Amino acid sequence: MTRLEEIPSGSRVAGVDEVGRGCLFGPVFAAAVVLDEVAEQRLWQAGLTDSKKLSAKRRAGLVPLIEQHCLTRGLGQASAHEIDAVGIRGATERAMLRALQKLAHPPNVVLVDGNLPLRLWSGSQQTVVGGDSRSAAIAAASVLAKEARDALIRRLSDQFPGYGLERHAGYGTALHQKALLALGPTSLHRRSFLRRLLG
């Protein structure tokens, strides 16, 4: 496994990250982003970092910059049904693979945020703990995945009123749990995540 600084210059490197792994509702999203060195510097200077450390306004402002400067990008998702069928790790890997498959050109190396390799990827890859702050491509992927998933959940909140989805994006807040106990789960809730709450 090569270290970040040992990746050959000129390699087409894709950063991959996911969002929504711990949610009770909706799909898990992933994004893959390929940047060159100039784009990396521009995005770091623009304030790019881990999406969880950015305000919603700052994240939204970075999306057009990422889209403008990246060489290619892809989004993927795996449904609540898939999460229930294969587990959250397997579903997350499906979402990541789908994001990678949407890139205009296959990468030479994939950087995966965290410490778990992408088992479905047969090419060269490297896990990067804390990748959102160490790799601009991973940080950019985290922003795109977060913005795409949040936009979907906002749309779905109109379809499934009463759960407060627009406020918590599907995470297991006290408000969300109270609504689940009162209303029961929707067709897009992850049943495997609700067993302890609903019995």
UniProtKB/Swiss-Prot annotation:
Record has Protein transport as a keyword: no
Limits of the RNase H type-2 domain: 11-199
A Gene Ontology biological process term: mismatch repair
Gene3D superfamilies named in the record: Ribonuclease H-like superfamily/Ribonuclease H
GO cellular component, one term: cytoplasm
Subcellular location: Cytoplasm
Reaction(s) the record says it catalyses: Endonucleolytic cleavage to 5'-phosphomonoester
UniProt keyword annotations, A-Z: Cytoplasm, Endonuclease, Hydrolase, Manganese, Metal-binding, Nuclease
PANTHER family: RIBONUCLEASE H2 SUBUNIT A (PTHR10954), RIBONUCLEASE HII (PTHR10954:SF18)
Listed name of the protein: Ribonuclease HII
Biological source species: Synechococcus sp. (strain CC9902)
Gene name linked to the record: rnhB
